[in-house]
Amino acid sequence: MGKIQLGYWILVLFIVTWSDLGLCKKPKPRPGGGWNSGGSNRYPGQPGSPGGNRYPGWGHPQGGGTNWGQPHPGGSNWGQPHPGGSSWGQPHGGSNWGQGGYNKWKPDKPKTNLKHVAGAAAAGAVVGGLGGYMLGSAMSRPVIHFGNEYEDRYYRENQYRYPNQVMYRPIDQYSSQNNFVHDCVNITVKQHTTTTTTKGENFTETDIKIMERVVEQMCITQYQAEYEAAAQRAYNMAFFSAPPVTLLFLSFLIFLIVS
């Protein structure tokens, strides 16, 4: 008799527990398709495709210039002052919070430690002021062959100048892996070149070309890691959000075993 009562209590507890877990909403990550699927090259600067930079929308010298960050006719420059506009890393016009005759108290500016930022990267630390981008974990720079001896040697000798972390948004905000990688490369290279240029170091066209290839491989690695993590979370949620009929069947089996 005592064993039957124990079985009933276990059955009730099991049903209540699984009912609560069944209310959880299953996430629906939207990972994209395979890399370079569809048979076409999405980035026209790769070997075997027409020459040129694969991410031409920013930072590349126009009119035959060689150094990144120099003024371009008719365009804007990262890290350079723009008439009537604002620049990365440059003072912006307008009013500042905490100044003027209304607020006497001014909070201290927080100190940012880059080591702390890198340490939080594994948890997907959100980078402030960059529209919700996260900083990925530090990676070893990939081994890449560029198809000619000069660029291979240049990369080996200068790879320390290139980033070892990427910036990205969650993969469920992109329709495909290609879109994720393209955005990841753009924001990572922009941020790195802007930060480095403000320290007085410029980048040549060769630097930009090599950096894009390196960061692209790192962004692919980051996407794969995010995709696997999202798939694991979806699997766990699917298990705990099983249909009520399945839960009742499992509860009945446990009741029979206990009884």
From Swiss-Prot:
One of its GO terms (molecular function) is copper ion binding. InterPro entries: Prion, Prion/Doppel_b-ribbon_dom_sf, Prion/Doppel_prot_b-ribbon_dom, Prion_N. Residues 91-101 have a biased composition (Gly residues). Disulfide bonds join C184-C219. It is found in: Cell membrane; Golgi apparatus. Residues 25-235 are annotated as: Interaction with GRB2, ERI3 and SYN1. Cu(2+) 3 binds at H82, G84. Residues 29-110 are annotated as: Disordered. The keyword Lipoprotein applies. SMART domains: PRP. Residues 1-24 form the signal peptide. It comes from the Eukaryota. Residues 237-259 form a propeptide. Glycans are attached at N186, N202. Cu(2+) 4 binds at H92, G94. PANTHER family: DOPPEL PRION (PTHR15506), MAJOR PRION PROTEIN (PTHR15506:SF2). It is linked to Found in high quantity in the brain of humans and animals infected with degenerative neurological diseases such as kuru, Creutzfeldt-Jakob disease (CJD), Gerstmann-Straussler syndrome (GSS), scrapie, bovine spongiform encephalopathy (BSE), transmissible mink encephalopathy (TME), etc. Belongs to the prion family. This is Major prion protein. It comes from Trichosurus vulpecula. The gene is PRNP.
